[in-house]
Protein backbone atom coordinates (compact mmCIF):
# COMPACT_ATOMS: atom_id res chain seq x y z
CA UNK A 1 0.00 0.00 0.00
CA UNK A 2 1.16 3.54 -0.74
CA UNK A 3 2.52 5.10 2.46
CA UNK A 4 0.21 8.09 1.99
CA UNK A 5 -2.75 5.75 2.51
CA UNK A 6 -1.57 4.27 5.80
CA UNK A 7 -4.00 4.71 8.70
CA UNK A 8 -2.23 4.35 12.07
CA UNK A 9 -5.52 4.83 13.95
CA UNK A 10 -7.06 1.81 12.21
CA UNK A 11 -3.93 -0.29 12.67
CA UNK A 12 -3.91 0.38 16.41
CA UNK A 13 -7.58 -0.54 16.66
CA UNK A 14 -6.83 -3.83 14.92
CA UNK A 15 -4.19 -4.53 17.53
CA UNK A 16 -6.57 -3.67 20.37
CA UNK A 17 -4.45 -0.76 21.55
CA UNK A 18 -6.05 1.95 23.68
CA UNK A 19 -6.18 5.37 22.02
CA UNK A 20 -7.03 8.57 23.88
CA UNK A 21 -8.71 11.34 21.93
CA UNK A 22 -10.07 14.87 22.07
CA UNK A 23 -13.26 16.31 20.56
CA UNK A 24 -12.77 19.40 18.39
CA UNK A 25 -15.80 21.70 18.23
CA UNK A 26 -14.02 25.02 17.73
CA UNK A 27 -14.19 24.80 13.90
CA UNK A 28 -10.80 26.41 13.30
CA UNK A 29 -7.61 25.01 11.80
CA UNK A 30 -5.59 27.06 14.31
CA UNK A 31 -7.18 25.34 17.31
CA UNK A 32 -6.98 21.96 15.59
CA UNK A 33 -3.24 22.36 15.10
CA UNK A 34 -2.75 23.36 18.74
CA UNK A 35 -4.59 20.19 19.76
CA UNK A 36 -2.51 18.10 17.37
CA UNK A 37 0.70 19.24 19.08
CA UNK A 38 -0.61 18.13 22.49
CA UNK A 39 -0.08 14.43 21.83
CA UNK A 40 -3.61 13.02 21.73
CA UNK A 41 -3.79 9.79 19.74
CA UNK A 42 -6.83 10.98 17.78
CA UNK A 43 -8.85 14.14 17.23
CA UNK A 44 -12.56 14.10 16.42
CA UNK A 45 -13.36 16.96 14.05
CA UNK A 46 -17.06 17.44 14.60
CA UNK A 47 -19.39 18.26 11.74
CA UNK A 48 -22.57 17.20 13.53
CA UNK A 49 -22.91 19.61 16.46
CA UNK A 50 -20.19 22.12 15.53
CA UNK A 51 -20.86 24.57 12.66
CA UNK A 52 -18.23 23.15 10.31
CA UNK A 53 -18.52 23.43 6.55
CA UNK A 54 -16.78 21.00 4.20
CA UNK A 55 -14.09 23.64 3.68
CA UNK A 56 -13.66 24.01 7.46
CA UNK A 57 -13.18 20.24 7.76
CA UNK A 58 -10.70 20.35 4.88
CA UNK A 59 -8.59 23.06 6.51
CA UNK A 60 -8.53 21.21 9.83
CA UNK A 61 -7.38 18.02 8.11
CA UNK A 62 -4.57 20.03 6.55
CA UNK A 63 -3.66 21.57 9.91
CA UNK A 64 -3.24 18.27 11.75
CA UNK A 65 -1.62 16.36 8.86
CA UNK A 66 2.04 17.00 9.90
CA UNK A 67 1.49 15.58 13.39
CA UNK A 68 1.04 12.14 14.93
CA UNK A 69 -2.52 12.79 16.16
CA UNK A 70 -4.94 11.03 13.82
CA UNK A 71 -8.04 12.90 12.58
CA UNK A 72 -11.52 11.40 12.70
CA UNK A 73 -14.32 13.21 10.89
CA UNK A 74 -17.91 13.13 12.14
CA UNK A 75 -20.22 14.40 9.39
CA UNK A 76 -23.64 15.77 10.25
CA UNK A 77 -25.20 12.57 8.88
CA UNK A 78 -24.34 9.40 7.03
CA UNK A 79 -25.73 10.35 3.63
CA UNK A 80 -23.97 9.11 0.50
CA UNK A 81 -23.18 12.57 -0.96
CA UNK A 82 -21.73 13.86 2.31
CA UNK A 83 -19.63 10.76 2.89
CA UNK A 84 -18.27 11.14 -0.65
CA UNK A 85 -17.22 14.71 0.07
CA UNK A 86 -15.45 14.03 3.37
CA UNK A 87 -13.60 11.07 1.88
CA UNK A 88 -12.52 13.12 -1.13
CA UNK A 89 -11.03 15.86 1.07
CA UNK A 90 -8.82 13.22 2.67
CA UNK A 91 -10.64 11.84 5.69
CA UNK A 92 -9.63 8.23 6.30
CA UNK A 93 -11.60 7.60 9.47
CA UNK A 94 -15.28 8.48 9.78
CA UNK A 95 -17.62 8.44 12.77
CA UNK A 96 -21.20 8.26 11.50
CA UNK A 97 -23.88 9.43 13.96
CA UNK A 98 -27.32 7.98 14.61
CA UNK A 99 -26.96 4.52 13.09
CA UNK A 100 -29.95 2.56 14.37
CA UNK A 101 -30.11 -0.54 12.18
CA UNK A 102 -27.91 -3.01 10.34
CA UNK A 103 -29.39 -1.80 7.05
CA UNK A 104 -28.25 1.75 7.83
CA UNK A 105 -24.81 0.40 8.66
CA UNK A 106 -24.65 -1.47 5.35
CA UNK A 107 -25.66 1.68 3.46
CA UNK A 108 -22.88 3.62 5.16
CA UNK A 109 -20.32 0.94 4.28
CA UNK A 110 -21.50 1.01 0.67
CA UNK A 111 -21.12 4.80 0.55
CA UNK A 112 -17.42 4.48 1.43
CA UNK A 113 -16.56 1.86 -1.21
CA UNK A 114 -16.00 2.35 -4.92
CA UNK A 115 -17.89 0.11 -7.36
CA UNK A 116 -18.24 -2.83 -7.63
CA UNK A 117 -18.06 -3.05 -3.82
CA UNK A 118 -20.14 0.03 -3.10
CA UNK A 119 -21.54 3.29 -4.38
CA UNK A 120 -18.86 5.90 -3.74
CA UNK A 121 -18.73 8.37 -6.60
CA UNK A 122 -15.51 8.37 -8.61
CA UNK A 123 -13.53 11.62 -8.63
CA UNK A 124 -10.06 10.62 -7.44
CA UNK A 125 -8.24 12.75 -10.01
CA UNK A 126 -9.59 15.94 -8.38
CA UNK A 127 -9.50 14.73 -4.75
CA UNK A 128 -7.00 15.50 -2.02
CA UNK A 129 -7.48 11.90 -0.83
CA UNK A 130 -5.71 10.63 -3.97
CA UNK A 131 -3.32 13.59 -4.03
CA UNK A 132 -5.10 14.80 -7.16
CA UNK A 133 -4.48 11.57 -9.02
CA UNK A 134 -0.83 11.20 -8.00
CA UNK A 135 -1.40 8.07 -5.87
CA UNK A 136 -1.25 5.22 -8.35
CA UNK A 137 -4.02 2.63 -8.10
CA UNK A 138 -5.73 4.68 -5.41
CA UNK A 139 -9.13 3.11 -6.00
CA UNK A 140 -7.72 -0.40 -5.70
CA UNK A 141 -5.93 0.33 -2.42
CA UNK A 142 -8.09 2.78 -0.51
CA UNK A 143 -10.57 0.36 1.08
CA UNK A 144 -7.86 -1.16 3.27
CA UNK A 145 -6.99 2.25 4.71
CA UNK A 146 -10.52 3.45 5.47
CA UNK A 147 -11.78 3.10 9.03
CA UNK A 148 -15.52 3.23 9.58
CA UNK A 149 -17.02 3.84 13.01
CA UNK A 150 -20.74 4.11 13.72
CA UNK A 151 -22.55 5.67 16.66
CA UNK A 152 -25.08 3.67 18.64
CA UNK A 153 -27.05 6.24 20.61
CA UNK A 154 -30.68 5.16 20.92
CA UNK A 155 -32.76 2.35 22.39
CA UNK A 156 -33.52 1.18 18.85
CA UNK A 157 -29.81 0.96 18.07
CA UNK A 158 -29.19 -1.01 21.26
CA UNK A 159 -31.92 -3.46 20.30
CA UNK A 160 -30.15 -3.93 16.95
CA UNK A 161 -26.58 -3.89 18.25
CA UNK A 162 -25.74 -7.51 17.48
CA UNK A 163 -26.93 -7.14 13.88
CA UNK A 164 -24.97 -3.89 13.48
CA UNK A 165 -21.85 -5.61 14.80
CA UNK A 166 -22.24 -8.32 12.16
CA UNK A 167 -22.02 -5.84 9.27
CA UNK A 168 -18.81 -6.32 7.31
CA UNK A 169 -16.86 -3.10 6.95
CA UNK A 170 -17.72 -1.66 10.36
CA UNK A 171 -14.48 -1.30 12.32
CA UNK A 172 -15.87 0.06 15.56
CA UNK A 173 -18.96 1.16 17.43
CA UNK A 174 -19.11 4.34 19.47
CA UNK A 175 -21.60 4.72 22.32
CA UNK A 176 -23.13 8.21 22.24
CA UNK A 177 -23.83 8.93 25.93
CA UNK A 178 -25.88 12.12 25.61
CA UNK A 179 -28.39 10.91 23.04
CA UNK A 180 -28.46 7.43 24.52
CA UNK A 181 -29.33 8.61 28.02
CA UNK A 182 -32.07 10.84 26.59
CA UNK A 183 -33.46 7.95 24.52
CA UNK A 184 -33.58 5.79 27.64
CA UNK A 185 -35.53 8.42 29.57
CA UNK A 186 -32.65 10.00 31.50
CA UNK A 187 -31.84 13.23 29.60
CA UNK A 188 -28.44 14.77 30.43
CA UNK A 189 -27.87 12.02 32.98
CA UNK A 190 -25.45 9.48 31.54
CA UNK A 191 -24.35 8.84 35.11
CA UNK A 192 -27.68 7.25 36.05
CA UNK A 193 -27.08 3.67 37.27
CA UNK A 194 -29.31 2.15 34.58
CA UNK A 195 -27.56 4.11 31.83
CA UNK A 196 -24.19 3.11 33.26
CA UNK A 197 -25.22 -0.54 33.29
CA UNK A 198 -26.27 -0.36 29.65
CA UNK A 199 -23.07 1.44 28.64
CA UNK A 200 -20.94 -1.21 30.34
CA UNK A 201 -22.90 -4.08 28.80
CA UNK A 202 -22.73 -2.48 25.35
CA UNK A 203 -18.98 -1.90 25.50
CA UNK A 204 -18.42 -5.50 26.51
CA UNK A 205 -20.69 -6.77 23.71
CA UNK A 206 -18.85 -4.66 21.14
CA UNK A 207 -15.44 -5.94 22.20
CA UNK A 208 -16.67 -9.54 22.39
CA UNK A 209 -17.75 -9.22 18.75
CA UNK A 210 -14.20 -8.28 17.77
CA UNK A 211 -14.95 -4.61 17.11
CA UNK A 212 -13.42 -1.50 18.64
CA UNK A 213 -15.51 0.29 21.27
CA UNK A 214 -15.52 4.06 21.64
CA UNK A 215 -16.86 6.68 24.03
CA UNK A 216 -16.75 10.40 24.83
CA UNK A 217 -16.45 11.21 28.52
CA UNK A 218 -15.91 14.79 29.65
CA UNK A 219 -15.57 13.64 33.27
CA UNK A 220 -12.20 11.93 33.91
CA UNK A 221 -13.66 9.30 36.24
CA UNK A 222 -16.16 8.26 33.57
CA UNK A 223 -13.39 8.01 30.99
CA UNK A 224 -11.40 5.77 33.31
CA UNK A 225 -14.46 3.62 33.94
CA UNK A 226 -15.07 3.12 30.22
CA UNK A 227 -11.45 2.14 29.72
CA UNK A 228 -11.80 -0.39 32.53
CA UNK A 229 -14.88 -1.85 30.80
CA UNK A 230 -12.84 -2.35 27.64
CA UNK A 231 -13.41 0.74 25.51
CA UNK A 232 -10.30 1.26 23.41
CA UNK A 233 -10.85 4.61 21.71
CA UNK A 234 -12.02 7.16 24.26
CA UNK A 235 -12.26 10.93 23.91
CA UNK A 236 -11.59 12.58 27.26
CA UNK A 237 -12.66 16.15 26.57
CA UNK A 238 -14.10 18.73 24.18
CA UNK A 239 -11.89 21.66 23.19
CA UNK A 240 -14.58 24.33 23.55
CA UNK A 241 -15.61 23.01 26.97
CA UNK A 242 -12.01 22.94 28.16
CA UNK A 243 -11.47 26.47 26.86
CA UNK A 244 -14.64 27.75 28.53
CA UNK A 245 -13.70 26.07 31.79
CA UNK A 246 -10.18 27.54 31.72
CA UNK A 247 -11.59 31.04 31.13
CA UNK A 248 -14.02 30.72 34.03
CA UNK A 249 -11.36 29.30 36.31
CA UNK A 250 -8.93 32.11 35.57
CA UNK A 251 -11.56 34.82 36.06
CA UNK A 252 -12.62 33.27 39.37
CA UNK A 253 -9.10 33.89 40.68
CA UNK A 254 -9.59 37.64 40.38
CA UNK A 255 -13.33 38.32 40.68
CA UNK A 256 -15.31 37.31 43.72
CA UNK A 257 -18.59 35.52 43.15
CA UNK A 258 -17.50 34.06 39.83
CA UNK A 259 -17.84 30.35 39.31
CA UNK A 260 -14.92 28.01 38.90
CA UNK A 261 -14.77 24.93 36.66
CA UNK A 262 -18.13 23.77 35.30
CA UNK A 263 -17.33 20.67 33.25
CA UNK A 264 -20.12 18.21 33.90
CA UNK A 265 -23.00 16.49 32.19
CA UNK A 266 -23.08 13.91 29.41
CA UNK A 267 -21.60 16.18 26.71
From Swiss-Prot:
Cofactor note: Binds 1 Mg(2+) ion per subunit. Is more efficient when using Ni(2+) ion, although it is not likely to be the physiologically relevant active site metal.
Protein biosynthesis in keyword set: no
Gene Ontology BP annotations: protein hexamerization
Catalytically driven reaction(s): 2-dehydro-3-deoxy-L-rhamnonate = (S)-lactaldehyde + pyruvate; D-glyceraldehyde + 3-hydroxypyruvate = (3R,4S,5R)-3,4,5,6-tetrahydroxy-2-oxohexanoate; D-glyceraldehyde + 3-hydroxypyruvate = 2-dehydro-D-gluconate; D-glyceraldehyde + 3-hydroxypyruvate = 2-dehydro-D-galactonate
Site (Transition state stabilizer) residue list: 74
Positions marked as site (Increases basicity of active site His): 88
Entry GO MF terms: 2-dehydro-3-deoxy-D-gluconate aldolase activity; 2-keto-3-deoxy-L-rhamnonate aldolase activity; aldehyde-lyase activity; identical protein binding; magnesium ion binding; nickel cation binding
Outcome reported for the amino acid change (mutating residue 49 to A): Loss of 2-keto-3-deoxy-L-rhamnonate aldolase activity
A single cellular component GO annotation: cytoplasm
EC number in record: 4.1.2.53
Named cofactor requirement(s): Mg(2+); Ni(2+)
One Pfam family hit: HpcH_HpaI
Binding site for Mg(2+): 153, 179
Positions with a binding annotation for substrate: 151, 178-179
InterPro entries (UniProt xref): Aldolase/citrate-lyase_domain, HpcH-HpaI_aldolase, KDR_aldolase, Pyrv/PenolPyrv_kinase-like_dom, Pyrv_kinase-like_dom_sf
Active site: 49
Family (UniProt): Belongs to the HpcH/HpaI aldolase family. KDR aldolase subfamily.
Job description of the protein: Catalyzes the reversible retro-aldol cleavage of 2-keto-3-deoxy-L-rhamnonate (KDR) to pyruvate and lactaldehyde. 2-keto-3-deoxy-L-mannonate, 2-keto-3-deoxy-L-lyxonate and 4-hydroxy-2-ketoheptane-1,7-dioate (HKHD) are also reasonably good substrates, although 2-keto-3-deoxy-L-rhamnonate is likely to be the physiological substrate. In vitro, can catalyze the aldolisation reaction between hydroxypyruvate (HPA) or pyruvate (PA) and D-glyceraldehyde (D-GA).
Oligomeric and partner information: Homohexamer.
Protein name per the record: 2-keto-3-deoxy-L-rhamnonate aldolase
Lineage start: Bacteria, Pseudomonadati, Pseudomonadota, Gammaproteobacteria, Enterobacterales
Gene transcribed to yield this protein: rhmA
